[in-house]
């Protein structure tokens, strides 16, 4: 008994399905019996077909800064009334809506005017939804590649204003009028991008009159998108490494010159920076229209490192100067030895006195004492017969030569130590100056744009 009931129920369902399919089959056959897809769906040729266009943005696929192309995944919703596709639902088993292939009916040839690809028209022919009043809804998916003027001046803290201009290709406003469904695109199903965020999106309808036909309006709907780049990726992978290279360059001046590793560290930093720039160059928009902020900062970092190498060479040269090759000017001694160390609270290096020593070693009277400390004979005059003795006189000349040589060596050592001290003072000054320049340079490049974005909210 139960089996019989189940079979009866299945039979009724199958009969309903067959009847429903039969009604739709009769309806489609009746609608398209004398239908032409090339004729505008109006009762009078003077009537205007009203087409409502809505744009649903699904995904921002790519922004090509070099070729200035924005690739988006969209759904283009189009609605209009076809005068020839109406019916009475009571005559067809209550069927009020049917789905039919879009290529079987008349369609407005809406295209993307600022298309940057080969296909201007929508080539994905999906089915349309048709109801008994003749109202048609067609929402084909499309991949739009639209031209957009990319301004990279503030990259990576930039905003781009891109647009999509939609309109009919062959129909003017006197036969087909397109109207926006809303004053902004539908973003309800938009999938967030990891690089861009849409701050604002608006749509406007335009009447355009061309010189060929000044009395005929051509209508288009233009959607504008204000997109702001998310800069975190570039901050972490480009800006922070460049900043660290700059600080590492400053530390060259903290390294003692005597260690002999100043130039090694400087060249190593330069080589590392060069390799780093070669790796990240593909991340920077390769356009000559403007120099982006990040390009300016990379250029600043390169100049900063090269300047440190040049100045390091000067400091090392100063450190190894000697009185035989360079005589220290008085202004250098006054500035770098007497003035700056006191201002900057350096511990002043102990230097030998520069007072002139008495060159005359012997006095008129020479007091000769016994080596053991016992009192010797009375003092003898310089012209004493003992002094005039050839052997004694030769010994005195030898002592005098040794004393003058020691004095000359001492003066030479003092002069060399003064040059080393000047180099040390220069290192301390340059350490502070380069740290300050690194900070000020970074702020000068990015602070203005960051403040502007903060004010915009």
From Swiss-Prot:
It is found in: Postsynaptic cell membrane; Cell membrane. GO terms for cellular component: acetylcholine-gated channel complex; cell surface; membrane; neuromuscular junction; neuron projection; plasma membrane; postsynaptic specialization membrane; synapse. The keyword Ion transport applies. One of its GO terms (biological process) is synaptic transmission, cholinergic. Pfam families: Neur_chan_LBD, Neur_chan_memb. Residues 21-230 are extracellular. InterPro entries: Neur_chan_lig-bd (IPR006202), Neur_chan_lig-bd_sf (IPR036734), Neur_channel (IPR006201), Neuro-gated_channel_TM_sf (IPR036719), Neuro_actylchol_rec (IPR038050), Neurotrans-gated_channel_TM (IPR006029), Neurotransmitter_ion_chnl_CS (IPR018000), Nicotinic_acetylcholine_rcpt (IPR002394). The chain crosses the membrane at residues 231-255, 263-281, 297-316, 429-447. Belongs to the ligand-gated ion channel (TC 1.A.9) family. Acetylcholine receptor (TC 1.A.9.1) subfamily. Alpha-1/CHRNA1 sub-subfamily. This is Acetylcholine receptor subunit alpha. It comes from Rattus norvegicus (Rat). The gene is Chrna1.
């Amino acid at each position: 008994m139960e089996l019989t009931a189940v079979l009866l129920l299945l039979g009724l369902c199958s009969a309903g399905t067959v009847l429903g399919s039969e009604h739709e089959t009769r309806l489609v056959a009746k609608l398209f019996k004398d239908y032409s897809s090339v004729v505008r769906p109006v009762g009078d040729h003077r009537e205007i077909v009203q087409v409502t266009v809505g744009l649903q943005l699904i995904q921002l696929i790519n922004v090509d800064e070099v070729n200035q192309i924005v690739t988006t995944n969209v759904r283009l919703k189009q609605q209009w009334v076809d005068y020839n596709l109406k019916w009475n639902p009571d005559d067809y088993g209550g069927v009020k809506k049917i789905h039919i292939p879009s290529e079987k009916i008349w369609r407005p040839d809406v295209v993307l005017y600022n298309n940057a690809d080969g296909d201007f028209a929508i080539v994905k022919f999906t089915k349309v939804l048709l109801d008994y009043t003749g109202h048609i809804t067609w929402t084909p998916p499309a991949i739009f590649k639209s031209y957009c003027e990319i301004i990279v001046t503030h990259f990576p803290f930039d905003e781009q204003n891109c647009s999509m201009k939609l309109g009919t290709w062959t129909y003017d406003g006197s036969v087909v009028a397109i109207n926006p469904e809303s004053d902004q695109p539908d973003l309800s199903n938009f999938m967030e991008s990891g690089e861009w965020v849409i701050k604002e999106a608006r749509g406007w309808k335009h009447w355009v009159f061309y010189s060929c036909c000044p009395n005929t309006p051509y209508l288009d709907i233009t959607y504008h998108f204000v997109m702001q780049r998310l800069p975190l990726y570039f901050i972490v992978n480009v800006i922070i490494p460049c900043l660290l290279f700059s600080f590492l360059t400053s530390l060259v001046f903290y390294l003692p010159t005597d260690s002999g590793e100043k130039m090694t560290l400087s060249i190593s930093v330069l080589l590392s920076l060069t390799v780093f720039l070669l790796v990240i160059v593909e991340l920077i928009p390769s356009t000559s229209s403007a120099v982006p902020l990040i390009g300016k900062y990379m250029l600043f970092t390169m100049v900063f490192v090269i300047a440190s190498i040049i100045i390091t060479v000067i400091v090392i040269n100063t450190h190894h100067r000697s009185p035989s090759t360079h005589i220290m000017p008085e202004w250098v001694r006054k500035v770098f030895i007497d003035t700056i160390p006191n201002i900057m609270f350096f511990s002043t290096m102990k230097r030998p006195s520069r007072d002139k020593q008495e060159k005359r070693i012997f006095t008129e009277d020479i007091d000769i004492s016994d080596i053991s400390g016992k009192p010797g004979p009375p003092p003898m005059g310089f012209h004493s017969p003992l002094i005039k003795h050839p052997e004694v006189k030769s010994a005195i000349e030898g002592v005098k030569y040794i004393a003058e040589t020691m004095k000359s060596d001492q003066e030479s050592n003092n002069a060399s130590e003064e040059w080393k001290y000047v180099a040390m003072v220069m290192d301390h000054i340059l350490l502070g100056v380069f740290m300050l320049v690194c900070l000020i340079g970074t702020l000068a490049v990015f602070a203005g744009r960051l403040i502007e974005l903060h004010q915009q909210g």
